Amino acid sequence: MEVAMVSAESSGCNSHMPYGYAAQARARERERLAHSRAAAAAAVAAATAAVEGGGGSGGSQHHHHPSRGACTSHDPQSGRGSRRRRRPHPEKKKVHHRQSSFPHCSDLMPSGSEEKILRDLSEEDEEEDDEEDEEEEGRFYYSEEDHGEECSYTDLLAQDDGGGGGGGSGGGGYSSVRYSDCCERVVINVSGLRFETQMKTLAQFPETLLGDPEKRTQYFDPLRNEYFFDRNRPSFDAILYYYQSGGRLKRPVNVPFDIFTEEVKFYQLGEEALLKFREDEGFVREEEDRALPENEFKKQIWLLFEYPESSSPARGIAIVSVLVILISIVIFCLETLPEFRDDRDLIMALSTGGHGGLLNDTSAPHPENSGHTIFNDPFFIVETVCIVWFSFEFVVRCFACPSQALFFKNIMNIIDIVSILPYFITLGTDLAQQQGGGNGQQQQAMSFAILRIIRLVRVFRIFKLSRHSKGLQILGHTLRASMRELGLLIFFLFIGVILFSSAVYFAEADEPTTHFQSIPDAFWWAVVTMTTVGYGDMKPITVGGKIVGSLCAIAGVLTIALPVPVIVSNFNYFYHRETENEEQTQLTQNAVSCPYLPSNLLKKFRSSTSSSLGDKSEYLEMEEGVKESLCAKEKCQGKGDDSETDKNNVSNAKAVETDV
């Protein structure tokens, strides 16, 4: 009896099980202990009676439990089919033990019979408990040992329904979907911050670093079963959202633009995503502006007149163009000086054949005696030289441009046309007046006024300097990006002008010496006051008018102060972007040479001071032909001991190719 109790206690529950399962196991253990004591007593009594009687039935010395054959089967059909009918009630288990195992105990030998009986009972109970646990685990996952396959519980239900003749879909509406297809997850560790997503989310973009299994394999950590990237953590939120949203890329506010751009390039999201992101950030595409003509001769001409940094001749042409523009602007301003304006008016009157004004003055020289005409005027000669250069430059650029449609859509080319046309219109009008003679003083005065207006357009030549000035280009980009803010500023000023001009008019209506005779007369005062200029030519006199003027000045300060910071922010953005581009150009010039890169090609890449026309074309075509000039990977990898040096050279060469 003592041996039986010790054997029963030795097969106790596992103390490392969870609390709920451990309590149930202890309850079952107490039931088995009581049952074992009763069974041991009955077995000892039966064995003693059998020895004394000297007889007994000759049966097999050991029988398996009736349910063990079904429980231990690993057949995928019979084993799974028997799982649903295998769990008897605990009370039935007790009866089953008594009816199946105990009648055969009479054949056991007295020596050690109690210990063997208890061992068999304990093993059978443990096997039944293990099978019950396996059946519970089978609800989620099942392993077929014979075939080495892994399938979900829903697959087993589908197989049982199809092969075992089970009716319906079963499983409470579960479908036959593989576990790996719907629930396969991947863990991504970015500098210690772990992200978890599904494989199908990354598979939407198979060309990217995370979407291509082969590309991301080199970052896999088998010990932690995760992918590790030593990259910027805040940027990865937007990178992962790019996969989750199906292609929407938005930079976090706490990540600088250059850092986020590097992360986008590292994760290989593609050029299309990068270009779209740059457009959202305010960048302007320049692919069309950077296009080159297909004809070689036109290409050289286009490089000379369009890209001053291409070569020394192109830089010289740019300097000449800037000087001509400055001379034209200086002449436009000097001809309005009083000492030159009288002669200019006289020449214009002589050319138009007028007989009034200066010509009616007795002190004025007579037209027949004066040898001055518009064609021998120094200002006209200088203006003609400038126009000849502008016309030549425009015609050559129009001839060599890659696309005529894009050429005439460019705002800089439109400015060139506007700056050239007034000269030819003025020249044609002067020639027509000289050939036609005097046709009336009123008609001549009208034509003279029109010519003055047309000549005023010459002031737009100053915008031609923006072609050669980065500062003016930045200002143009700033104004174009701030059109909405400028529109709001004008709208606010318009509302303020209407409001305060009306208020000051009615406030000063009873004052006889007031300057505000009408509301339109007060518009000028409202604009000057709101912009804090304050000329003082118009001012309120009454107390009510002064109060309105004070409110107008305060409202003007607030109105201008609201949109101005946004405009300044846009200017800083474009300025820093231009600075970053210049820094990248300097880094490109300091790139380490590759041993397989031709020295003359690298020399022309580092400095563009050559004198031939073909140098810049080769410089700009380097992006297309650099792959043929750089060392191939196979050649670099076949150097043996110099593999590390070759790898560095390849990386530097790639940097050169990217920066170009």
Curated annotation (Swiss-Prot):
Assembly information from the UniProt record: Homotetramer and heterotetramer of potassium channel proteins. Interacts with KCNAB1 and KCNAB2. Interacts with DLG1, DLG2 and DLG4 via their PDZ domains. Interacts with SIGMAR1. Detected in a complex with KCNA1. Interacts with KCNA2. Part of a complex containing KCNA1, KCNAB1 and LGI1. Interacts (via cytoplasmic N-terminal domain) with KCNRG.
> What's the source species for this entry?
Bos taurus
Q: Which reaction does it catalyse?
A: K(+)(in) = K(+)(out)
User: Which ranges are annotated Basic and acidic residues under compositional bias?
Assistant: 636-647
Q: What is this protein called?
A: Potassium voltage-gated channel subfamily A member 4
Q: Which PANTHER family match?
A: POTASSIUM VOLTAGE-GATED CHANNEL SUBFAMILY A MEMBER 4, VOLTAGE-GATED POTASSIUM CHANNEL
**Purpose:** Voltage-gated potassium channel that mediates transmembrane potassium transport in excitable membranes. Forms tetrameric potassium-selective channels through which potassium ions pass in accordance with their electrochemical gradient. The channel alternates between opened and closed conformations in response to the voltage difference across the membrane.
Tissue specificity here reads: Detected in cerebellum, corpus striatum, hippocampus, cerebral cortex and brain stem (at protein level).
Q: Which GO terms describe its molecular function?
A: delayed rectifier potassium channel activity; potassium ion binding; voltage-gated potassium channel activity
Domain notes from UniProt: The N-terminus may be important in determining the rate of inactivation of the channel while the tail may play a role in modulation of channel activity and/or targeting of the channel to specific subcellular compartments. The transmembrane segment S4 functions as a voltage-sensor and is characterized by a series of positively charged amino acids at every third position. Channel opening and closing is effected by a conformation change that affects the position and orientation of the voltage-sensor paddle formed by S3 and S4 within the membrane. A transmembrane electric field that is positive inside would push the positively charged S4 segment outwards, thereby opening the pore, while a field that is negative inside would pull the S4 segment inwards and close the pore.
Q: From the record, what ranges are coiled-coil? A: none
Glycosylation sites recorded in the entry for this protein? N360
Composition skew (Acidic residues), residue ranges? 122-137
Q: Identify the coding gene.
A: KCNA4
